[in-house]
Amino acid sequence: MEKLQVFSPLEAVDLRCVRGERTLFQGLSFTLRGGELLRIGGANGSGKTSLLRIVCGLLEPDRGEVRWGGESIRRLKEEFWARMIYIGHANALKDDMSAAENLGVACALAGIVADERQIAAALARLGLSGRENPPVRALSQGQRRRAALARLALGAAVPLWVLDEPFTALDAAAVEDVQSLIRGHVSRGGGVLYTTHHEASIGAAVSRRIDLAGT
């Protein structure tokens, strides 16, 4: 397993997000440090996905900023992105490519070095042994979600994981597989920011929740 890169504090400072005439959240500040798990809660439409996209630098806040190690992520850009894995609620898989091919491309784009054996092992870790090679269009929704999440099995060295509804479409065994990966990452000093409607406890030592309702 690769050594974890240094985790610099992730800070959200006075964030405000507006959609149309509606303010989703405002005055939102928090800090995520290595070894911590932070769940973002709130009702549908409260801005959970927008917040994660802001944290990743994929969406500009209407006010405030996100910092990594005290520096604005807008200035750091690629340097910050190289230290993060973001898995959105959409799987972002190419239907005409296999799970193995999709994972290989995702790793290459993220700068994660992984050979065919490691890719196969990562997919097996998520319960896709024997399903590595069919095109993704032939997989069930749960299998597609597992294929997307297999990046986590190869991302032990990447300090920050940002996960939007990672347990969607997963059966109980797959949920436990993903929870185990998250627990392991946090125990090694990584940080995880995530949303979920799944109520089972991940069981990390340092776990917090921020609810967007009323911000």
Where are these regions (language model features)?
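Conserved structural motif at the start of ABC-family nucleotide-binding domains
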Residues: L10, F25-G27
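The feature captures the beta-strand-to-loop junction immediately N-terminal to the Walker
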Residues: G41-A43
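Helix-to-loop junction immediately C-terminal to a conserved catalytic motif
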Residues: C56
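Conserved ABC transporter NBD signature motif
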Residues: G64-R75, E79-F80
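Q-loop/switch helix immediately C-terminal to the Walker
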Residues: A90, D95-G111
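Conserved ABC ATPase signature
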Residues: D96, P135-G142
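Conserved ABC ATPase "signature" region
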Residues: G104, E116-R131
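Catalytic Walker B motif of ABC-type/P-loop ATPase nucleotide-binding domains
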Residues: W161-E165
